[in-house]
């Protein structure tokens, strides 16, 4: 076996035909990170017949006076093939040593277990063998984490898409379905955007992701060249929103009037339950009144609508990845992100994609999980 540096084209061809890979193992991602002042190169192992067997995107970062390499999501290799893993590791170490790189860090796509509400925890049968193999090759395991301590998340939420979108919708939790319907009813509309919307996406995500606007621009433009990226946003239709609030206010007004009428009809013998009901209905009316005033102001200030959520998706093989998403916290109550995610699931399911990767989450089985709300 031999190792060599691959050209961008050689790596791209190998990666595109490799059975399982991540957007972070692509030349597009490498070029994006180059714009963030990281160096990168590709290594490939081939046999005597010049057939490429394994490859890796290597990014180099300064660590004081030293340099170390990082392979995001690990090598493009069959980790079940012990001989290939051993040989590739040996050759990579030798190559990096010649480049005065002191270490390599990987976050490989090796599944330890799968958790579903239906089946519970399903342990991957080959994980322990792969784990022990890597340890024997002097890879140092940094330990299991429950939250977001690693460069790439330990846990990912992945949804199996179903072209029967009605059935897929029925599998969503009742609470989530209610929010989706409510968001659609009050006037949230989903639209496809382009690079002109990147500054807005950055504004919505800058507190959540440690990336700058130039990163978003590079990411979008490199993946766009191969039609691998989509940007969508949720717009609050302020006119429709006002109409909906007006309707709810009128309906609530009728309810309040009816309760008041019931009390007058039963003067002197009005039950405590009727009085309590009136207080509850009046409070609801007061809330709607404030919402009505706010909705009127929104229409006056933003007659063309307000963008309240946005997301970037990368399409790779049969899977779609939610790379970045964000929403305006001032409009959290309209549940725009819920509708946006559902509409994207629906769209990609109809296009034949099989999985929807929502990205990193915290440990779903951890008690007293401080990030539990982010998993919902």
Where are these regions (language model features)?
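Extreme N-terminal starter segment of soluble prokaryotic enzymes
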Residues: 1-2
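A conserved beta-strand-loop-helix scaffold within acyl/acetyltransferase catalytic domains
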Residues: 5-49, 54-65, 139-150, 160-164, ...
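Acyl-donor binding region in acyl/amide transferases
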Residues: 66-149, 315-376
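Active-site neighborhood for divalent-cation/phosphate handling
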Residues: 153
């Amino acid at each position: 076996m031999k190792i060599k540096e691959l050209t961008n084209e050689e790596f791209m061809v190998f990666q595109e035909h490799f059975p399982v890979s991540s957007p972070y193992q692509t030349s597009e991602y490498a070029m994006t990170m180059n714009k963030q002042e990281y160096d990168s190169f590709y290594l490939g192992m081939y046999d005597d017949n010049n057939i490429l067997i394994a490859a890796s995107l290597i990014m180099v970062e300064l660590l004081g006076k030293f340099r170390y390499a990082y392979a995001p999501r690990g090598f493009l290799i069959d980790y079940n093939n012990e001989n290939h893993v051993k040989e590739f590791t040996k050759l990579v170490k030798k190559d990096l040593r010649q480049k005065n790189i002191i270490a390599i860090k990987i976050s490989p796509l090796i599944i330890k277990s799968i958790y579903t509400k239906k089946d519970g925890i399903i342990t991957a049968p080959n994980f322990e063998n792969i784990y022990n193999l890597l340890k024997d090759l002097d890879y140092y395991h940094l330990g299991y984490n429950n939250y977001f301590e690693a460069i790439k998340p330990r846990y990912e939420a992945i949804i199996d898409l179903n072209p029967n979108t009605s059935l897929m919708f029925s599998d969503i939790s009742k609470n989530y379905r209610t929010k989706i319907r409510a968001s659609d009813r009050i006037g949230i509309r989903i639209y496809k955007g382009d690079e002109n919307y990147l500054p807005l996406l950055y504004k919505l995500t800058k507190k959540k992701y440690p990336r700058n606007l130039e990163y978003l621009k590079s990411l979008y433009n490199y993946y766009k060249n191969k039609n691998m990226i989509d940007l969508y946003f949720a717009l609050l239709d302020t006119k429709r929103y006002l109409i909906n609030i007006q309707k709810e206010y009128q309906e609530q007004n009728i309810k309040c009037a009816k309760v008041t009428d019931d009390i007058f009809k039963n003067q002197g013998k009005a039950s405590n339950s009727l009085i309590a009901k009136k207080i509850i209905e009046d409070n609801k009316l007061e809330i709607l009144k404030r919402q009505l005033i706010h909705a009127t102001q929104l229409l006056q200030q933003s007659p063309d609508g307000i963008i309240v959520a946005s997301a970037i998706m990368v399409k790779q093989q049969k899977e779609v990845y939610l790379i970045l998403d964000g929403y305006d916290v001032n409009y959290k109550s309209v549940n725009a992100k819920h509708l946006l995610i559902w509409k994207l699931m629906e769209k990609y399911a109809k296009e034949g994609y099989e999985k929807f990767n929502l990205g990193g989450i915290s440990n779903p089985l951890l008690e007293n999980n401080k990030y539990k709300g982010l998993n919902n």
